[in-house]
């Protein structure tokens, strides 16, 4: 999934590693990286390389994904969404916190890619 997003974005010299973490590990990572002692769904780090390539790490917490699923949604779809979300962060996209988040350029792009990955559904 991340590879497809990278290709759609034209990121030819980029690689993203995906890691699934349990709740305790995600909470520790969030505390270490950002000083926030709470659980979160996805954390992404971009590591630009001297040769111009880009490496990224995306950490996803499936337990949070399960809690985020609403209105008959599926966990698989939410995991795809979080993978796309983290990959876009690695590529430099960002969004505001709060209600404006779902109206941001990043969010619209994310949802377009999620639909593509789900085969045009929704």
Summary of predicted features, one role per range:
Residues 1-78, 90-122:
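Active-site rim/adjacent substrate-binding subdomains
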Residues 82, 86-90:
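Catalytic glutamate of the conserved HExxH
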């Amino acid at each position: 999934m991340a590879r497809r997003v990278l290709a759609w974005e034209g990121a030819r010299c980029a690689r993203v590693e995906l890691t699934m973490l349990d709740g305790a590990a995600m909470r520790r990572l969030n505390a270490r990286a950002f000083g926030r002692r709470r659980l979160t769904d996805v954390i992404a780090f971009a590591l630009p390389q001297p040769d111009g390539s880009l490496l990224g790490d995306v950490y996803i917490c499936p337990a949070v994904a399960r809690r985020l699923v609403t209105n008959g949604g599926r966990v698989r779809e939410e995991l795809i969404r979080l993978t796309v979300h983290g990959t876009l962060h690695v590529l430099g996209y960002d969004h505001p916190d709060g209600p404006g988040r779902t109206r941001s350029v990043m969010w619209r792009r994310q949802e377009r890619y999620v639909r593509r990955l789900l085969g045009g559904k929704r």
